[in-house]
Amino acid sequence: MQDYSVSGDFGQVKFYNTSLSSGRFKSTGKILCMGWHCVNPLYSISRPNGLDTNLLLLTRRGKGDIAISGKEFNALPGTAIILPRSTPHSYRAAQGCEWEFYWLHYNGGHTQAYTEDILTAAYS
């Protein structure tokens, strides 16, 4: 997939394809792609079956509403949220808000164990 930048009624998105799967990343995992979004409440993503990758969302500005396996979270500036692979989720800009965030899809190697350790520590 090629890099792209798209604007529309929903806001603006940028996508960067990467292949950081060699060298030191090979044994620990792979950053598959990353990007930046600055969106309004028209932007909404719903994945009832989740993804086949882990997804890290980093809020820079505004507010996002995120649902993970039926639990609701607010993504405020400075918030990092991990959406584990194969986990149902949805996210959108909060009503009346613009939401600017960075995202990163990663998978492979030791990333699943790291993700589980981070989530266990966060919720224990």
Segment roles from a protein language model:
Residues M1-F73, Q95:
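Generic protein-terminus/edge-of-domain signal
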